[in-house]
Amino acid sequence: MREITTGKILKDQKVTGTGFLVAENIVVTAKHNVLTAEDIVDDGTIHEREIWFLITEDDPVRGKTMNLREAEKRGIDCVFIRLEEKLSEKPITVLTEAENDFTGDFCKISGYPKEASGKIELQGCIANGTEDKFIISVNKEDELQDYQGLSGSPVTIFGCVIGIVIRQENSERLEALPVKYIRNVLKCHDVPFLSLIHI
């Protein structure tokens, strides 16, 4: 099983969500964690943003978005951030473009919702999905009233990241972007993927 390094995403010194390491110096998160309507210049221009990634409370690492303009143009709630330093000495490949249907499979989500005091792990079941999203039914004992801060968290099956959380439907259900969709929509040249495996 692969170890997945998750951390908090900070924008303008405020925690906006969760992100996780997908390469030695690249983090992925939900685009809305780093871009709000106020960030878009009057003429519609979008500039790459400085973002901080925080694994331990007192040691944030600075980075800059790699594909914010492209993500906004293509309408996908996902962005990659290149960090100024490597956080791993060994190659990392956690994003998994799987070929099978996950409906009915159990999954895990780990991240930093504001309602919790630190990192938590939720378990659930993939309820249904389409090419561009899937729905997770959170186990009753793991349900929260508000999942704010969980956006950008990895969704894993057997340690493989198959998606990232982008929003909450209600206290019982979360919506996620499939890795396969992210790879099809965004240029991800510097990001390693495991392609078309059966989990």
Describe the residue ranges of each PLM region.
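A short, polar/charged loop-to-alpha-helix boundary motif
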Residues: 171-182
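Serine endopeptidase catalytic core focused on the charge-relay Asp
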Residues: 2-16, 20-24, 31-39, 43-134, ...
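Short solvent-exposed strand/turn elements
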Residues: 84-89, 139-146
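Conserved PDZ fold ligand-binding element
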Residues: 27-28, 162
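Conserved small/polar residues in nucleotide/adenosyl-binding loops
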Residues: 197-199
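Catalytic nucleophile loop of clan PA
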Residues: 20, 143-166
